[in-house]
């Protein structure tokens, strides 16, 4: 074999070995996500589709659940490595009961996506009309639950909180009169509002205590954090890179449209509805307010101590 031919063969072999090594280096992470199709909760899915997590040596296996409390339980049990978009009140309450979980990042600051609505034919037209009515939230301990409790407290309502599961299931229950007031999260249901089928009564921005604090978090379990800290660091970096990409590249909207199956007119509005700064992951905002709301909502009997907070908040950078 000539030297030129040998060089060509060796180069080809190097490419094959390099490709295999790249494939071998992809580390699996199991991630639980609530409310399939949501913009903010879709970071892991979109980053996976856009190749960003792969660039950081990660291959995500994604499980969709109804709401954050389910994903927290999956992380506690060890069947999932990470839970994203879990309600911070549920995370705090679960930790306070001794669960081996750690918060690794903020997922949403404020609640610009959250809203409550009634069918267009309903006599409910303002927040005060919630009195004596059943008002939906997903699952106990979710961010929609904590948000509703804060709304009730702020406006001194006698509303009846009612668990309705997913946003899609809630729409069905609200439109058929099984519950008086539904909850939603943008961009879900906005097409119904534009078509005049539902009336949005209030949003998360109407709840003062939610405006500047973290409402949802990403978390893992102690075992995963201790044994795979470098992996969690790479996850956080890929996650942050994905958020930046979602707000800068039209390709992200294309992926989101395919993922969410939402009408194009809604997909195009999504980045205006949820500002990029609300999805900052490197800090948990409003700790004092988080503690106050968690106590008021009976998620914890008393605020966590500084030592407990130091143990719970483990934002790997």
What are these regions (language model features)?
Residues 1-3:
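N-terminal secretory signal peptides that target proteins for export/translocation
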Residues 7-18:
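Bacterial N-terminal signal peptides
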Residues 19-25:
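Sec/Tat signal peptide C-region and signal peptidase I cleavage site
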Residues 55, 206-211, 276-285:
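Short, solvent-exposed loop/beta-turn-alpha elements that line the ligand-binding surface or hinge
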Residues 168-256:
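Pocket-lining segment of extracytoplasmic ligand-binding domains
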Residues 292-317:
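Conserved C-terminal helix/tail region of periplasmic/extracytoplasmic solute-binding proteins
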């Amino acid at each position: 074999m000539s030297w030129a031919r040998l060089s060509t063969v060796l180069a080809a072999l190097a490419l094959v070995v390099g490709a295999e090594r790249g494939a071998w280096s992809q580390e699996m992470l199991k991630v639980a996500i609530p409310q399939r199709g949501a913009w903010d909760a879709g970071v892991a899915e979109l980053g996976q589709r856009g190749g960003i997590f792969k660039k950081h040596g990660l291959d995500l296996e994604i499980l969709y659940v109804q709401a954050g409390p389910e994903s927290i339980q999956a992380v506690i049990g060890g069947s999932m490595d990470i839970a994203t978009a879990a309600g911070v009140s549920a995370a705090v309450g679960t930790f306070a009961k001794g669960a081996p979980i750690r918060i690794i990042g903020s997922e949403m600051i404020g609640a610009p996506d959250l809203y409550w609505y009634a069918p267009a034919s309903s006599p409910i037209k303002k927040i005060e009309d919630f009195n004596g009515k059943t008002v939906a939230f997903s699952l106990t301990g979710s961010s929609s639950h904590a948000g509703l409790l804060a709304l009730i407290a702020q406006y001194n309502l006698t509303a009846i909180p009612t668990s309705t599961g997913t946003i899609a299931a809630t729409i069905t229950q609200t439109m058929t009169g099984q519950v008086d007031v539904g909850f939603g999260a943008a961009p879900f249901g906005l097409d119904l509002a534009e078509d005049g089928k539902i009336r949005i009564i209030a949003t998360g921005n109407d709840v003062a205590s939610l405006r500047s604090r973290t409402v949802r978090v990403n978390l893992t379990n102690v075992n995963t954090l201790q044994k795979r800290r470098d992996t969690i660091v790479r996850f956080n970096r890929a996650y942050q890179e994905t958020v930046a990409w979602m707000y800068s590249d039209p390709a992200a909207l294309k992926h989101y449209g395919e993922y969410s199956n939402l009408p194009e007119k809604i997909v195009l509005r999504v980045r205006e509805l949820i500002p990029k700064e609300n999805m900052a992951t490197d800090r948990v905002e409003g700790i004092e307010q988080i503690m106050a709301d968690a106590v008021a909502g009976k998620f914890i009997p008393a605020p966590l101590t500084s030592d407990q907070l130091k143990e719970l908040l483990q934002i790997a950078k």
